Amino acid sequence: MLRRDFLRSSAIGFGALSLGQRELLSHFFDDPWKITMLKNDIGIFTEKGGTIGFLLSKDGIITIDSQFPEQAQHYIDEMKKKGGYPFKLLINTHHHGDHSSGNISFKGTVQRVLAHENSKKNQEKVAQLNKTEDKQLYPNEVFGKVWEEKDSGEKLTLRYFGAAHTDGDAIIHFGHSNIAHMGDLVFNRVHPFVDRSAGANVKSWMDVLDKTLKQFDKKTTYIFGHAAPGYNVTGTREDVKAFRDYLEQVYNFVDAQVKKGISQEDLVKIKTLPFDTEWKGDGLDRPFKAIYEELTMYK
C-alpha cells in the first residue's frame, strides 16, 4: 500500500477511536510540520499555508508570517523548545489569511507586529467584510518603502517595490546571512493567485521581480510562500527569474488572445499554455482572469 493511501485510510479509522486510543496512536505519526534550518540561526517552518521564516536570537525571535492559528501555535510551541527566547517581532509579508490568520496566536506573546501600510489596510478591510475582526492581530507598526533594523548581527531590511501579488507585498532580507523572504511574490512552479481586489497588478509584478533581481546578488537564498509538489520553498535567483519570465509569457499570451477578441469565459477554458514551462497543473485560470481584467478594465 502506498504511504499516502495508508495515511488516508488510517485517518478515516482514526476519527472513530476513543480519545485515549487516538492519543496512543498519534505517537506513531510524524508531526505534520517541518522545521528546516538554513543558515546562522535562520530557518523555515512549513505545515499549512505560506512558509514561515524565523531568526532565533537571545534578544528575541523574529518571525515572518504566521499561517493559520493552529499552525502558528505549533510553531510557537516548537520555538519554545529551542531556548525559550521571547517573541520579539512578527512580520507579515502581506495580508492573506494563510500568512496572517495565525497572528492571533501571538496575542500577548509578541511585542511588535510589522507589515507594509497597505497590508494592514487590506487585512482590516477583509476582516470587516468577513466579520472576523475579533480573530485578528493587526500590525502595530507599518512602513512605506524601506524599513531597517539591526538585530543579533543581522541587518534586517524590509522593502516594498510596488503592486504585485497584492498592493502590499514586502520583501524581508537578512543582510548578513543574505536570505530574502519573498512571501507570495514568487510561486515556485505553482500558478499564482493574483488578488485584484487588493490591488494586484501582473505588469507591475514583473517590474517588482526585476527590481528584486537587481537588489540582491547571485548568492542570495530566497524563501517562497508556496511551491508545487516536488519543488522547494527555498531557491535561487534562477527560480525568481524563471517565475518572472513565466509571468511575462502568460501576460503576452493573454494579451494576444484579447487582441483577437476572446472572451474571459473562453479564455479560462484553456487549460494548457502553448509554450514550454515548468508551471503546470490546475490554477491557470487565476492568472488568466487577472491579466484579462488588467488588460480590459479601461476598454
Each predicted region: which residue ranges?
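Metallo-beta-lactamase
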Residues: 37, 119-162, 166-167, 175-176, ...
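C-terminal regulatory/interaction regions
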Residues: 260-299
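Divalent-metal (often Zn2+) His-rich catalytic cores of metallo-beta-lactamase-fold enzymes
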Residues: 206-262
